[in-house]
A protein has these predicted regions:
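RNA-binding basic/glycine-rich loop and surface signature characteristic of RAMP-family CRISPR effectors
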Residues: 1-331
């Protein structure tokens, strides 16, 4: 095997170690009755990287393309003709963060990847095997509906797309064992040669500052669990403020440093109480009221021990935005 290129551009990978101790598996909260907090978190999602690409699985082509015009490109996801970010994409991205920072099971892995026995995917069998890791208790597992759901995110105002050229995306040749993989928020490296060529592809993306309206529905969650979700959305407590700690990445082409987003402008709608009348009467928190509620839940989360300290510190330090370019070529 030829030696690796010592001058190769650093890859934007983050490896978060899987702890040696197994997850804290407990009985999940179920759906027979309402307990804890039930409601919806409304917020904006703003593109923080140069571009965001959420693929539809389809492509378009221009039979008249010449010169540096793209001939074939992968399209952005749409619902009824409108640009959209599927709720499943948001849920998957946030769940992967929750799994990493709470020392939960590894729910998604490919055949041949070696996962420690202690962190194998949770299994739920009523009356036989009911204890689940923190992430599976929140997001669900086969046989048990989750308590957190994301709606499709729709554009705020008019959003223009752009066809951009990126290096081809290949499967990694080697997986790091005993680690979870994420992607850093580095700077997108624009290619000067726009012509179609082997080893590159074109994608339809939305640009920085594009905003989408999001909704996260939660049911029967504890304050600490809701605080955990706020941490996973990139929030961080700073004395009396809630600040951006890191930018989660969603969508495709993450190895090309696309997909970093910021969640903001929270509005919380809570339902609950001891009577049906109390439950049907929603309580809305906006502005400073919503921020104080976020702080309260995040404080409860820190006190609860839900977050695995060393995993969180490693993840947070590696996921902060970096003023470095992504590799331009194939890797």
């Amino acid at each position: 095997m030829p030696p690796r290129n010592p001058n190769a551009e650093p890859k934007p990978f983050v490896w978060v170690p899987i702890p040696s101790e197994g997850p804290q598996r407990r009985e999940p909260t179920t759906h027979e009755r309402f307990v804890g907090l039930t409601g919806v978190l409304e917020f904006t999602l703003t593109v923080n990287s140069a571009y965001l690409f959420v693929g539809s699985g389809a492509y378009e082509f221009d039979p008249n393309a010449r010169g540096d015009r793209p001939d074939v490109w992968y399209t952005f996801y749409r619902r009824n003709g409108q640009l959209c970010i599927p709720g499943t994409s948001l849920k998957g991205a946030i769940r992967s963060i929750v799994e990493a920072i709470t020392n939960s099971c590894v729910s998604q892995y490919k055949r041949g990847e070696e996962i420690p026995l202690s962190h194998q995917r949770c299994s739920y069998r009523p009356g036989k095997q009911e204890n689940l890791c923190p992430a599976c208790r929140l997001f669900g597992v086969a046989g048990l509906r989750g308590r957190v759901h994301f709606a499709d995110a729709i554009p705020v105002g008019r959003i223009e797309t752009e066809i951009i050229k990126i290096g081809e995306l290949w499967e990694p040749s080697r997986q790091e064992e005993q680690n979870r993989k994420f992607y850093q928020a580095k700077r997108y490296a624009e290619l000067s040669d726009k012509r179609p060529q082997t080893g590159y592809r074109f994608v339809e993306a939305v640009k920085r500052e594009a905003s989408f309206q999001c909704r996260m529905y939660f049911e029967n969650v504890a304050e600490a669990e809701l605080g955990l979700l706020f941490f996973a959305l990139g929030c961080e407590k700073d004395e009396e403020k809630v600040v951006i700690g890191f930018t989660p990445k969603i969508g495709g082409a993450k190895p090309r440093c696309l997909g970093a987003v910021v969640f903001g402008k929270p509005k919380v709608v809570l339902r609950g109480g001891s009577t049906l009348k109390d439950f049907l009467h929603a309580r809305s928190l906006t502005g400073d009221g919503a921020i104080r509620f976020l702080q309260q839940c995040m404080q409860k989360c820190q006190e609860s021990g839900l977050i695995h300290k060393s995993s969180w510190e490693k993840f947070r330090s590696e996921m902060r935005d970096r003023d470095e370019f992504c590799p331009r070529g194939m890797y």
